[in-house]
Amino acid sequence: MAAGVVFLALSAQLLQARLMKEESPVVSWRLEPEDGTALDVHFVSTLEPLSNAVKRNVPRCIIILVLQEPTAFRISVTSSCFVQNTLTKLLKDRRKMQTVQCATARETS
């Protein structure tokens, strides 16, 4: 298992524990994997099971796009596995965006 995956798994478990214990449903989290990618993530617990969001036909891509907004957002946290998958997707999307920006900057210069 790669170091980044282990980091995300541990972060997901800690994040879920904090959401369940804290009176305030908002948890801010800074991800800093070994590859140098840093990402600030803010979770707001809604106490709504993920299955309800799926029943309402909320696509995963919409949830991910909302997560990338700088404003507060909502996400249902029902398992550390779901949080881990979400954080992994966020980091991958951020890396892709940075790669495209670097390539675009090289082409225009």
From Swiss-Prot:
Residues 1-17 form the signal peptide. It comes from the Eukaryota. Disulfide bonds: none annotated. The keyword Signal applies. It is found in: Secreted. GO terms for cellular component: extracellular region. InterPro entries: BAGE-like (IPR012530). It holds the Pfam family BAGE. Keywords: Secreted, Signal. Not expressed in normal tissues except in testis. Expressed in 22% of melanomas, in bladder and lung carcinomas. Unknown. Candidate gene encoding tumor antigens. Belongs to the BAGE family. The ancestral BAGE gene was generated by juxtacentromeric reshuffling of the KMT2C/MLL3 gene. The BAGE family was expanded by juxtacentromeric movement and/or acrocentric exchanges. BAGE family is composed of expressed genes that map to the juxtacentromeric regions of chromosomes 13 and 21 and of unexpressed gene fragments that scattered in the juxtacentromeric regions of several chromosomes, including chromosomes 9, 13, 18 and 21. This is B melanoma antigen 2. It comes from Homo sapiens (Human). The lineage of its organism: Eukaryota, Metazoa, Chordata, Craniata, Vertebrata. The gene is BAGE2.
